[in-house]
A protein has these predicted regions:
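Phosphate-coordination loops involved in phosphoryl transfer and adenosine-cofactor binding
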Residues: 2-4, 73-74, 136-138, 192, ...
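A Rossmann-like FAD-binding core segment of flavoenzymes
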Residues: 65-89, 94-97, 157-255, 294-298
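Internal hydrophobic alpha-helix adjacent to the cofactor/substrate pocket in enzyme cavities
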Residues: 23, 154, 158-164, 281-299
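Beta1-alpha1 glycine-rich phosphate/pyrophosphate-binding loop at the start
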Residues: 3-68, 138, 148-175, 190
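FAD-site-proximal beta/loop scaffold in flavoenzymes
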Residues: 107, 112, 118-134, 229-280, ...
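Glycine/small-residue-rich loop that forms an oxyanion/phosphate-binding "nest" at active or ligand-binding sites
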Residues: 72-134
Length: 299
């Protein structure tokens, strides 16, 4: 099966790229990447013209993209080159495209502490909207200080959890508006503290924290731990084509979302762009599609 453009990833960046490329008259196929982080966001207030859950917005994007592209519900396992063609191999088929757009996003960054992996699914979670309802009326800790952590804490409070935010610094990185919502709900914050280990028997029962100011450990009883300490880019597939990445693993792109490999473009959270938001991911996708169109037009 041959296409003009293959888009790997179906979050905001990938779906926008598919819409724009399809409207340019290109034959486009979109492959599922990691589940989009947007689908787990409980509420969105900074995407112009839309207020609602991330899942609702993503479903609208998928519906629109389906008018301009094919959608393969297959996992991409490898990418390569065959002459002028890029080859995309899934767990069940093989596809060829003249250009490729990586919109693979990222996955949750781990703390790397004892008990984290052992209690995953038994009190440890990386998705408040997925697992929060299991902890109604129970005590939970949210680890982190950015937008995701604060949003998770607010959401968990709203559904009836006893929430405490734990942050390693003395001030949050989250947007001011989110911070105001957090404090308005009287959600307590444990400042200047990091997780040492997560303990329990069959499930999470307590978390050992380290106070960086006092330089001492202390214990907090908890039934759940929601970890929101950032993302790790999913760029291993792009690297197989020789695409350059920075020291953190993000794909290097120019203002046109072009990589160092002709015909290979990238968009969204997998790129080294400074701001990672839904609206910027969509912009990246549009630019990447335009660049792919210009690349194919020259060829």
């Amino acid at each position: 099966m041959e296409y003009d453009v293959a888009v790997i990833g179906c979050g905001p960046a990938g779906l926008t790229a598919a819409i724009y490329a399809g409207r340019y008259g290109l034959k486009v196929i979109v492959f599922e990447g990691m589940p989009s982080q947007l689908s787990t966001v409980p509420f969105i207030e900074n995407y112009p013209g839309f207020e609602g859950s991330g899942y609702e917005l993503l479903e609208k994007m998928k519906e629109q993209a389906s008018k301009y592209s094919e959608h393969a519900f297959e996992r991409v396992v490898d990418v390569g080159k065959d002459g002028d063609w890029f080859v995309v191999k899934t767990d069940s088929s093989e596809y060829k495209a003249k250009a490729i757009i990586f919109a693979t996003g990222g996955t949750h960054r781990e703390l790397g502490v004892p008990g984290e992996k052992e209690f995953l699914g038994r009190g440890v979670s990386y998705c408040a909207t997925c697992d929060g309802h299991f902890f109604r009326g129970k005590k939970v800790l949210v680890i982190g200080g950015g937008n995701t952590a604060v949003t998770d804490a607010i959401y968990l409070k709203e559904i009836g959890c006893d929430v405490t935010l734990v942050h390693r610094r003395d001030e949050l990185r989250a947007d001011k508006a989110l911070q105001e919502e957090l404090f308005k709900r009287n959600i307590p914050v444990i400042w200047n503290s990091v997780v040492v280990r997560i303990e329990g028997t069959q499930k999470v029962e307590r978390v050992v924290l380290h106070d960086k100011i006092k330089d001492e450990d202390f214990v907090v009883e908890a039934d759940g731990v929601f970890i929101a300490v950032g993302m790790r880019p999913q760029t291993e597939l792009a690297a197989k084509l020789g695409v350059e990445r920075d020291s953190r693993g993000y794909i290097k792109v120019d203002r046109r979302q072009r990589t160092n490999v002709p015909g290979v473009f990238a968009a969204g959270d997998c790129c080294d762009n400074p701001l990672k938001q839904v609206v910027t991911a969509c912009g990246d996708g549009a630019v990447a599609a335009n660049s792919a169109f210009e690349f194919l037009k020259v060829k």
